[in-house]
Regions:
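An exposed, glycine/acidic-rich loop-and-rim segment of catalytic or binding clefts
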Residues: 1-230
């Protein structure tokens, strides 16, 4: 077998985890421009932890807490209660993530309930290396997308959809991740990489991407119903 998901060996390492390895991210994953939002006529300032923006729930988002654990016959359920005003968000929110083994599949189900209108966009932040270790830049990737969301230097969308044809974002045909990244190769450990939203083709449940480990031959296929993938 090959361990294809990055992780740490101790709880202490996870508590100092600045890369969100394997974390439940919330209340809202990704960035909120200017670290504020308006809801029901009220303005809510949030913690600025990514320049002037708010990222992955703030300074102490859901990833920085040890959740309560309930053992199930076929898995486990994690729960925590986020109090009103945590990181600037309104409402007391009770969130749960249930992990279940279904045959050869691991299923994650997210639920959240708040006593006030609020924002909620939970995700899992796992990192995959299909070789089981070393650089992943030699992995071959295909993405079924015609455009990416243009972004500012602060990684905030501008609203413009930029065609991928002829750019480094063109993964319409499978290619190594490192092919169009200047100064990188399959042996590199550091790169600016890709941190962009791909606007996926089609609608409904469909293939979004196919990733292949260059040394292991392991293939991961990503399916989604969403319009984009980052």
């Amino acid at each position: 077998w090959v361990d294809v998901v990055l992780g740490y060996d101790s709880l202490a390492e996870y508590e100092q985890n600045d890369g969100y390895l394997g974390a439940v991210v919330g209340r809202v994953c990704n960035r909120i421009a200017g670290a504020e939002f308006e809801l029901d006529g009220n303005r809510y300032p949030l913690y600025q932890n990514d320049g002037v923006n708010h990222l992955h729930g703030g300074k102490r988002g859901f990833d920085k807490y040890v959740w309560a654990v309930e053992e199930l016959p076929d898995g486990l359920r994690l729960t925590r209660t986020s109090p009103d005003g945590e990181e600037g968000y309104p409402g007391t929110m009770r969130a749960s993530v249930t992990y279940r083994v279904d045959g050869v599949s691991l299923r994650l189900d997210y639920e959240a309930e708040s006593d006030r209108d609020t924002l909620c966009n939970l995700t899992n932040h796992s990192y995959f290396n299909l070789n089981g270790g070393g650089s992943a830049l030699g992995h071959t990737l295909q993405v079924f997308a015609d455009a990416v969301t243009e972004r500012t230097p602060g990684l905030i969308p501008t609203g413009v959809l930029a065609p991928v044809a002829g750019t480094k974002f063109d993964f319409s045909a499978p290619k190594p991740l490192c092919r169009d990244l200047p100064g990188t190769d399959a042996g590199s450990l550091h790169t600016d990489g890709y941190d962009d939203n791909f606007c996926l083709s089609g609608t409904g449940l469909r293939e979004a991407a196919v990733l292949t480990g260059d040394r292991s031959g392991i293939i991961m296929t990503v399916l989604t119903t969403t319009p984009g993938m980052q």
